[in-house]
Amino acid sequence: MQTIALVDDDRNILTSVSIALEREGYRVETYTDGASAVDGLIARPPQLAIFDIKMPRMDGMELLRRLRQKSDIPVIFLTSKDEEIDELFGLKMGADDFITKPFSQRLLVERVKAILRRASSREASAATGGTLKPTADQQARTLERGQLAMDQERHTCTWKGEPVTLTVTEFLILHSLAPAAGRGEKRDALMDAAYDEQVYVDDRTIDSHIKRLRKKFKLVDGDFDMIETLYGVGYRFAEAA
């Protein structure tokens, strides 16, 4: 049974999220602040951790910083709408994804499943020492569009040879958008690509992900302008010049 650590000072969130995850067969360990969680997470690493950012005694960012000194387990942050700067810092520290409050329990569960699948694939690849010849399916998972390169098997993305750190959802959105270079994708299609099941997300959710994608690419290339807005429709990954 896979274990998930949940750290939040809101006991209602601890209870509701624990119930949702336990229904899916996960074991859940809960903590009410970062200070009480740090020793337990290092001594008994779970398969995945979910942190709130703003907590008493030790916030989620400091907890992640200390955890990363000992462990590389996947981490999802629960954030407020005004914590965009914290998100960028969290990604640099090694967070895997962010979910904005208030959130759907079903959405959170699907994010957890997606990240654990990715982690399992990464561990399997590491176990082989990277020496196995890629299968046809694995080769098909490698996408190249101009200066963009994405490896779905390893969940890596580069632009002009420079790595770009993406969350699971951002990766899936871009991996759906890039093959349609020059044509564009409707928001509904991007939602379907990013979420495994019929999880409700509104247009603004996709818009927020696109905004973060643009910012991340601009960190490695200040002139990046390849993700274009198609007003009233969706987005387009521009064709390489």
From Swiss-Prot:
Domain Response regulatory: 3-116
Lineage of source species: Bacteria, Pseudomonadati, Pseudomonadota, Alphaproteobacteria, Hyphomicrobiales
Residues with PTM 4-aspartylphosphate: 52
PTM comment, free text: Phosphorylated by ChvG.
Cofactor(s) required, per the database record: Mg(2+)
Membrane-spanning parts: none
Binding positions (Mg(2+)): 8-9, 52
Transcription keyword on record: yes
Record-annotated DNA-binding residue ranges: 140-239
Keyword terms, alphabetized: Cytoplasm, DNA-binding, Magnesium, Metal-binding, Phosphoprotein, Transcription, Transcription regulation, Two-component regulatory system
Organism: Rhizobium radiobacter
Major subcellular location class: cytoplasm
Name used for this protein in its record: Transcriptional regulatory protein ChvI
